[in-house]
């Protein structure tokens, strides 16, 4: 399973440091041992008790009380913005009754020891300080933060599930120690979308309880209406395990909502989308609601010649996109700016004037990928004091993603 974290030492370190993670028993709330914090309000910085230099943003839902136990989601942003996911999803936390914690320190580029200490400090906060249900501790992340969340879920234990947005698992030769419930979310314009599609197949083979959500969007924290699927997923998984009572009304509402979406897929003739939505519907409600009718519909789609044709087209595009990404890497410093202007203009013309929606989304992903490649290349050569290469990388960055390029220059004082 491909990723950017490759050292087995990282896995061993996390396993050792977090081997004493939260247990799997449930007890009654004890207000005497719970830190009083204002509910229904985001607290931007709460200092960890174990390491005072480490902090997190906190949100207690409006219905929070120390007399009850609440599920918690610990969020990891790639830029260390603990408050960002809390601001986006606090209404969902209120609706479903979740505590939200967002790391202020975990971010891309940290060494293994620092990341391990941060994670250890955060998880120590889930015991004793707030009224948390130890059977329902979840980790969530976006981009590099999704890889951190997955690493915790796969190797720590004590986490019921992982919500991975915009990136998949870290790469490792080590076998997973745990199989948490897992849901991935990616936009059609996300350069990591194909990675998550492939990961979904691998999780099927590995017998994970999992689901995968695709939406029309870019490489970013998902919109609230998309993220709500993840909250529903964690609720349904908890119902299956008997952690919370079965909520028939919630289940039926979800089924009806998905049936409407599937109906629209049929109207537009998008059988790949229809297939994906049927698969997810079955995964969500399996063990909670009859799935026989949905499985029959899925079989009908899979046996149709038009679906097979659309699926073959999709696989061809994925192969083409992988080759194009490699070409962008290979040509990054060897081609001049005029060549890059023509390349990027070609993507933009296909996006604005193209009639093949699959090609349009592919070009959006390639532009997004080139933006990331430019950013990473710029930082790498700048740290080596290669000013000419840095100038070249920034010029490409300014063409493909001018807004983020300006922000990067401002951050660097350039």
Predicted regions and their residues:
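Gly/Ser-rich "nucleophile elbow"/oxyanion-hole loop immediately N-terminal to the catalytic nucleophile
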Residues: 62-69, 112-143, 147
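Short beta-strand element of the alpha/beta-hydrolase
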Residues: 68-78
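Short amphipathic alpha-helix adjacent to the substrate-entry channel of hydrolases
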Residues: 84-101
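C-terminal catalytic histidine-bearing segment of alpha/beta-hydrolase fold enzymes
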Residues: 204-282, 288, 293-303, 308
């Amino acid at each position: 399973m491909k990723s950017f974290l490759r050292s087995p030492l990282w896995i061993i370190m996390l396993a050792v440091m977090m081997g004493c993670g939260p247990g799997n028993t449930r007890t009654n709330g004890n207000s005497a041992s719970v830190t009083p914090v204002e509910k229904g309000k985001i607290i931007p910085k709460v200092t960890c008790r174990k390491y005072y230099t480490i902090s997190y943003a906190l949100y207690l839902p409006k219905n929070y009380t120390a007399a009850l136990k609440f599920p918690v989601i610990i969020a990891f942003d790639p830029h260390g913005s603990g408050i960002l996911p809390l601001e986006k999803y606090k209404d969902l936390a209120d609706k479903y009754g979740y505590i939200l914690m967002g790391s202020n320190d975990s971010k891309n580029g940290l060494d293994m020891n620092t990341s391990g200490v941060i994670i250890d400090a955060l998880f120590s906060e889930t015991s004793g300080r707030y009224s948390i249900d130890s059977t329902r501790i979840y980790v969530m992340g976006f981009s590099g933060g999704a890889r951190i969340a997955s690493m915790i879920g796969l190797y720590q234990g004590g986490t019921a599930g992982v919500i991975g947005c915009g990136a998949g698992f870290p790469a490792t030769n080590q076998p997973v120690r745990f199989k948490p419930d897992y849901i991935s979310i990616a936009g059609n314009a996300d350069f990591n979308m194909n990675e998550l599609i492939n990961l979904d197949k691998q999780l099927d083979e590995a017998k994970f309880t999992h689901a995968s959500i695709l939406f029309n969007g870019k490489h970013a924290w998902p919109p609230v209406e998309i993220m709500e699927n993840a909250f529903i997923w964690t609720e349904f998984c908890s119902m299956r395990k008997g952690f919370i009572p079965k909520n028939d009304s919630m289940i039926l509402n979800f089924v009806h909502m998905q049936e409407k979406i599937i109906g629209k897929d049929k109207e537009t003739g998008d059988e790949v989308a229809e297939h994906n939505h049927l698969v997810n519907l079955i995964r969500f409600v399996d063990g909670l609601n009859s799935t026989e009718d949905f499985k029959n519909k899925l079989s009908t789609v899979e046996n149709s010649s038009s679906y097979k044709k659309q699926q073959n087209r999709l696989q061809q595009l994925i192969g083409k996109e992988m080759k194009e990404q490699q070409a962008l890497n290979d040509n990054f410093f060897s081609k001049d700016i005029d060549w890059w202007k023509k390349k990027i203009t070609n993507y933009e013309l296909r996006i604005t004037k193209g009639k093949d929606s699959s090609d349009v989304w592919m070009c959006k992903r390639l532009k997004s990928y080139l933006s990331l490649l430019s950013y990473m290349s710029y930082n790498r050569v700048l740290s080596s004091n290669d000013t000419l290469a840095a100038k070249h990388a920034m010029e490409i960055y300014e063409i493909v993603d001018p807004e983020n390029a300006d922000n990067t220059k401002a951050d660097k004082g350039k």
